Amino acid sequence: MRIQVKGRSGFSVDAELLARVEKKLGKVGRQVSPLAELEIELREERNPAIRDGQVAEATLHLKGVTLRACKRAPDMGHAINLVADDLSRQVKKHRDKRRARREAHRVAQERAA
């Protein structure tokens, strides 16, 4: 899986954040095809009235489907963890749906034959 990390609105991505993204989203990479592409955007909301000012947005491009997750947290590391968990849940749900459809189709063909 190819991972592309971007910093938006003047947010700079340092080596520590890059390593954290690789580690946490690598778990998602084991669940999907090696051809999948993941784009993650990290940014900081500058409004002091917003408590959860650190934002992580992830877009996972798979064959035939695009999964998105956007999470906010007071700390960027926590926002990355939340996005990774959400994407992992979405990938599992998508995989289970595909498996159920494939199995239902196979059973229908066996009954018809």
Go through the PLM ranges and name each one:
Residues 1-113:
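N-terminal, polar/charged subdomain of small-to-medium soluble alpha/beta proteins
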